[in-house]
Amino acid sequence: QNPIEQEGTYPLPEAQVDRFMLKVIIDYPTLEEEKLIIRENLAGSLPKVTPVITADDIVEARKVVEKVYIDEKIEQYIADIVFASRYPDRYGLSQLKDLITFGGSPRASINLARASRAYAFIKRRGYVIPEDVRAIAHDVLRHRIGLSYEAEATNVTSEEIISDIINKVEVP
């Protein structure tokens, strides 16, 4: 999604949005980065890009990520986070009940587990810890939580709802 240029585009139905693993927010470059962009662009030279990894390396890394261990307690934690987005009152989050029209689907749980594995891999661990789940939860869930009219009217965001959930759900 490009939040600036939306003319001629249509919002995807919820079921199609749910098929995207992540919704990553990319901000503008910093002032220093933008000055570098200007400088390099005006110089007319394209930066030389040298590969740091091969296609075979990527395939191999994917196999390693699939082997990153997720304990049953972490699976329970992931399921609890997603269930709390559907049934907030069961998790002591009754204040969220009227703010959410729909919560994460089973696909949200699957993708939160997969993304947590990838995050653990990036952190050079062969196992997932709760901090991995918490670190990636916003990217996995922000597009999977439907906001009610009340939430929109009071400027409550999915980011805030996800933060409330991960701060309340018991960590194993």
Whereabouts are the PLM-identified features?
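Canonical AAA+ ATPase core
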Residues: 1-68, 117-119
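Alpha-helix N-cap and coil->helix boundary residues
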Residues: 12, 33, 53, 69, ...
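Residues that form generic nucleotide/phosphate-binding pockets
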Residues: 37, 61-64, 81, 164-168
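Short alpha-helical scaffolding segments that buttress acidic/His motifs in well-ordered protein cores
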Residues: 37-38, 78, 82, 136-141
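C-terminal engagement/docking regions of AAA+ P-loop ATPases
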Residues: 87-172
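Conserved AAA+ ATPase small/helical "lid" subdomain
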Residues: 48-112
